[in-house]
A protein has these predicted regions:
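Glycine-rich phosphate-binding loops of nucleotide-dependent enzymes
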Residues: 1-138
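A short, hydrophobic C-terminal helix/tail in secreted or cell-surface proteins
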Residues: 139-145
């Protein structure tokens, strides 16, 4: 019986960690929103004491408010020292959550490095598969100046 109680406690803690403390563990996952289903998957990994979590295009079907919530949870997981693999075609998302990047094209490793280097046009070209243009944002003077 003690083992079951520990398991329940871990499930409750995991649901709390992803902001779903009010969700009953017996609720049917398929009846939840897509965002809640994704958070349940993260909680499931946490409850099983995973050392690494894979996020594969996690924002592709989420409304913006849920995207922000997911990023907050990812940041907390990073602070706890969990290993995270974040797969996305959205460069800004990758830059927001990653410390390092790896580029795959057609199943092959093309490049990897520090996320701060992702502004380099050569690296961006490898990511998008075509030449990238670097530009500097200029502020033009108005008639008042």
């Amino acid at each position: 019986m003690l083992i079951r109680e520990r398991q329940r406690d871990r499930v409750r803690q995991a649901l709390d960690d992803v902001g779903l403390a009010d969700l009953a563990p017996t609720e049917i996952v398929g009846e939840q929103s897509v965002a809640t289903q994704q958070l349940i998957e993260v909680a499931r990994a946490l409850a099983s004491d995973a050392k690494m979590i894979l996020f594969d295009e996690p924002t592709s079907s989420l409304p913006q408010r849920d995207v922000q919530r997911l990023f907050e949870i990812i940041e907390r997981l990073k602070q706890r020292g969990l290993g995270l693999v974040y797969i996305s075609h959205f460069l800004e998302e990758v830059r927001r959550v990653a410390d390092v990047y790896s580029v795959l094209r057609d199943g092959r490793h093309v490049d990897s490095g520090r996320i701060d280097d992702v502004t380099d046009p050569e690296i961006v070209s490898k990511m998008v598969g075509r030449n990238a243009v670097s530009y500097t944002h200029l502020t033009l003077p108005t008639n008042d100046q």
